[in-house]
Amino acid sequence: MKFKTNKLSLNLVLASSLLAASIPAFAVTGDTDQPIHIESDQQSLDMQGNVVTFTGNVIVTQGTIKINADKVVVTRPGGEQGKEVIDGYGKPATFYQMQDNGKPVEGHASQMHYELAKDFVVLTGNAYLQQVDSNIKGDKITYLVKEQKMQAFSDKGKRVTTVLVPSQLQDKNNKGQTPAQKKGN
């Protein structure tokens, strides 16, 4: 039973790492191969409903990935593997991951939602993503993982805010070029 719980929890960690990919960078290559550690004040399992609930100071770690939440619920509709839905709740729920380029990605929201079958991630309620000094914030951020498409929304009367640091954009654009090639641009 512990293996099933850890397998379901792997999807939560995968969700956070996929979400982190929405800021242009690549996750630390071996993170998802690392063991998953989950700590919480309480844990409950509803075998008939296919639901695992972690409550109270939930901490999920895998490699450089770290998620903190007040509550994490993993549901497997119909008991089908690969159809898991993961919801994390907090004031806020947070995540952190180091990227291969050595730059961390951090984020938070009141709710983090991930649908494994659709590779669809949603941050809702004061949603925020940051890499170094570049960030995006809004009331809701959605990410289609396979298509690498992100959208940010805000409630009526509010606006989405994005801060891009030019040096970070240049680092990405000059990736793989020698110093001489960079000077020639």
From Swiss-Prot:
Q: Which NCBIfam families match?
A: outer_YhbN_LptA, PRK10894.1
Q: What does this protein do?
A: Involved in the assembly of lipopolysaccharide (LPS). Required for the translocation of LPS from the inner membrane to the outer membrane. May form a bridge between the inner membrane and the outer membrane, via interactions with LptC and LptD, thereby facilitating LPS transfer across the periplasm.
Identify the stretch(es) annotated as Disordered. Answer: 166-185
Q: Which GO terms describe its biological process?
A: Gram-negative-bacterium-type cell outer membrane assembly; lipopolysaccharide transport
The protein's induction, as recorded, is: Transcriptionally regulated by sigma-E factor.
InterPro entries cross-referenced by the UniProt entry:
LPS_export_LptA (IPR052037), LptA (IPR014340), OstA-like_N (IPR005653)
UniProt-listed Pfam families: LptD_N
Output the Gene Ontology cellular-component terms. cell outer membrane; outer membrane-bounded periplasmic space; periplasmic space; transporter complex
Describe, as the record does, how this protein assembles with itself and its partners. Component of the lipopolysaccharide transport and assembly complex. Can form head-to-tail homodimers and oligomers. Interacts with LptC, LptD and with the lipid A domain of LPS.
Q: What is this protein called?
A: Lipopolysaccharide export system protein LptA
A single Gene Ontology MF term assigned here is: glycolipid transfer activity
Q: Which organism is it from?
A: Escherichia coli (strain K12)
Superkingdom of this protein's organism: Bacteria
What residue range is the signal peptide? Answer: 1-27
Q: What does the UniProt keyword field contain?
A: Periplasm, Signal, Transport
Main location per the UniProt record = periplasm
Result of changing R76 to D/E = No change in activity
